[in-house]
Amino acid sequence: MNENLFASFITPTILGLPLVTLIIMFPSMLFPAPTLLITNRLVSIQQWLIQLVSKQMMNIHNHKGQTWTLMLMSLILFIGSTNLLGLLPHSFTPTTQLSMNLGMAIPLWAGTVIMGFRNKTKISLAHFLPQGTPTPLIPMLVIIETISLFIQPMALAVRLTANITAGHLLMHLIGGATLALMNISMTTALITFIILVLLTALEFAVAMIQAYVFTLLVSLYLHDNT
């Protein structure tokens, strides 16, 4: 266990060089390309998951929106695999860094908004002022809608960061409590260890759910602008 509670969120380095780039590239090695005539089980599961998620997520889109299918499927695989790898002992989770999550959220959000203004300029501008708004409230509503638009990428990034960070902190605290209680009461330590195992299983689910939620919200932003 790390002595510092937040040590697991510090970017690891070797000889002063940050390893975050290598860590970010590592999940891509887990999903081999189906180059063989007969695929193995890993590739089959990968293709089945992609088809299942793409059908559920992309059915609401028109032709322009469906051109984003490959990008969104790559996004959910990347975030999900990164979150799962971060649950391994002595590992680092890049999605606990707000800067990285903003780096994913802002370009994707900006792409959907720019597409909306290019393809549906009048409809996109109409979102800033609901129909039937009283004249004295027009300036205030325009400001509020503008703020709500620009806060969307921040909400995406903060949601992912907060959920992943909170889970890791809880696992760290309960794991430390289990080690400390072993010298006091083995029964209490065993109960705490069972809680840790259940929390770890929950974090595996949270890792995949947060990847799905992040991608789903990007898909909804895309649907609103296509």
Swiss-Prot record:
Xref: InterPro entries: ATP_synth_F0_asu, ATP_synth_F0_asu_AS, ATP_synth_F0_asu_bact/mt, F0_ATP_A_sf
Single GO MF descriptor: proton channel activity
Catalyzed reactions per annotation: H(+)(in) = H(+)(out)
Keyword line: ATP synthesis, CF(0), Hydrogen ion transport, Ion transport, Membrane, Mitochondrion, Mitochondrion inner membrane, Transmembrane, Transmembrane helix, Transport
Compartments, as annotated in UniProt: Mitochondrion inner membrane
Spans through the membrane: 6-26, 68-88, 97-117, 138-158, 164-184, 200-222
Name the record gives this protein: ATP synthase F(0) complex subunit a
Single Gene Ontology BP annotation: proton motive force-driven ATP synthesis
Membrane topology reported for the UniProt record: Multi-pass membrane protein
SUPFAM superfamilies associated with the record: F1F0 ATP synthase subunit A (SSF81336)
Quaternary structure and interacting proteins, as annotated: Component of the ATP synthase complex composed at least of ATP5F1A/subunit alpha, ATP5F1B/subunit beta, ATP5MC1/subunit c (homooctomer), MT-ATP6/subunit a, MT-ATP8/subunit 8, ATP5ME/subunit e, ATP5MF/subunit f, ATP5MG/subunit g, ATP5MK/subunit k, ATP5MJ/subunit j, ATP5F1C/subunit gamma, ATP5F1D/subunit delta, ATP5F1E/subunit epsilon, ATP5PF/subunit F6, ATP5PB/subunit b, ATP5PD/subunit d, ATP5PO/subunit OSCP.
Entry similarity comment: Belongs to the ATPase A chain family.
A cellular component annotation (GO) from this entry: mitochondrial inner membrane
Main subcellular location: mitochondrion
Job description of the protein: Subunit a, of the mitochondrial membrane ATP synthase complex (F(1)F(0) ATP synthase or Complex V) that produces ATP from ADP in the presence of a proton gradient across the membrane which is generated by electron transport complexes of the respiratory chain. ATP synthase complex consist of a soluble F(1) head domain - the catalytic core - and a membrane F(1) domain - the membrane proton channel. These two domains are linked by a central stalk rotating inside the F(1) region and a stationary peripheral stalk.
